From Swiss-Prot:
A Pfam cross-reference name: NusB
Function: Involved in transcription antitermination. Required for transcription of ribosomal RNA (rRNA) genes. Binds specifically to the boxA antiterminator sequence of the ribosomal RNA (rrn) operons.
Protein name: Transcription antitermination protein NusB
Domain of life: Bacteria
Organism, as annotated: Buchnera aphidicola subsp. Acyrthosiphon pisum (strain Tuc7)
InterPro entries recorded: NusB-like_sf (IPR035926), NusB_fam (IPR011605), NusB_RsmB_TIM44 (IPR006027)
An example Gene Ontology molecular-function term: RNA binding
GO cellular component terms, semicolon-separated: cytosol
SUPFAM superfamilies membership: NusB-like
Length: 143
């Protein structure tokens, strides 16, 4: 599957997570409704569902992973920024097959598309700090 399909899956997941957080509707119903309105042709649907189900199922743990790297409380974050960070931290924590640099870059790109003017800088700062302190940036040498 093309990387652009996965990028679109992240963007769609972000929109559904945003809607879910505001409306408190059932996440699966929100996803089905959202996808009815979208052209699903170039979206990695399997990854889209993995993100929304995985993030909503493990939301408290993901939020706890983020907290040490934030300058303010989770509740003070905008809904978009919180959803972007949840996607990025989910990938960092659960998807070892995705390079950490990809997760950071995708989070930044989502922030540029959907966030406020300086959201991408905030997302970049949080993710850079997390990757460094969590040790994802260390190279593994196999001898």
């Amino acid at each position: 599957m093309k990387p652009s399909f996965r990028r679109k899956a992240r963007a769609c997941a972000l929109q559904v997570l945003y809607s879910w957080e505001i409306s408190h509707n059932n996440i699966k119903e929100s996803a089905i409704y959202f996808l009815k309105e979208k052209n699903k042709k170039n979206i990695d649907i399997v990854y889209f569902y993995e993100l929304i189900i995985g993030i909503t199922y493990d939301c408290k743990n993901i939020d706890n992973l983020m907290k040490p790297y934030l300058f303010r409380s989770l509740k003070e974050l905008g809904h978009i920024e919180r959803a972007i960070l949840r996607i990025s931290f989910y990938e960092l924590h659960k998807r070892n097959d995705i390079p950490y640099k990809v997760s950071i870059n995708e989070g930044i790109e989502l922030a540029k598309l959907f966030g406020s003017e300086d959201s991408h800088k905030f997302i970049n700062g949080v993710l850079d700090k997390a990757v460094f302190k969590m040790g994802y940036n260390k190279k593994v040498v196999i001898t």
